[in-house]
Amino acid sequence: MDIMEFLKTRRTYRRFEQKPVEPAIAREIMEAARIASCGANRQTLKYVLVQSPEMVAKMQPLVHWAAYLPPEQGQPKPDETPVLFVAVCQDESLPGCNDTDTGLALANMTDAAWAHGVGSCIMGAIDRPAIKELLGLGGNLRLHSVVAFGYPTHKSHLVAMQNGNVKYYLDDARDYCVPKRPMEEILLKTL
């Protein structure tokens, strides 16, 4: 698969098989985060890998899915939940914490996962205080986001945006349709 096809299919996935992500793949996802580019090589990010079924189950009610969809459509059913989470933290005791570095690490993790057919969902709609307590995070660690991982049970397609509507939706097969703006709208000029 060429890089553009890879990027078009490495979308957000929200329903998963109940099959564990192999330890070597989980480790590779974390290695991808570790080696991500970062400003001034500061390396301010820290992670918690949540993979035991008990802890994954405790995380599930603390994350919120698919804000554009009604819960009965967007919320994974008990047999569709992720099998692994990664909590992404910014260590504010280190200089230079920023969201750009966090975004680079998130992209590395989700790309590394997708190279093995593991889908992901980067989540910002989370119960930060409860997750920090559950994971024993304190001090200078700011919980930025959580990433859900698993083998997807649905597809996700890019579609042309209609009337400026950015809201994703489900088609008749319960696959996600994700509207994207046309190139003419996002490329301001070529000089």
Across the structure, where does each feature detected by a protein language model lie?
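Acidic, surface-exposed loops and disordered segments
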Residues: 1-191
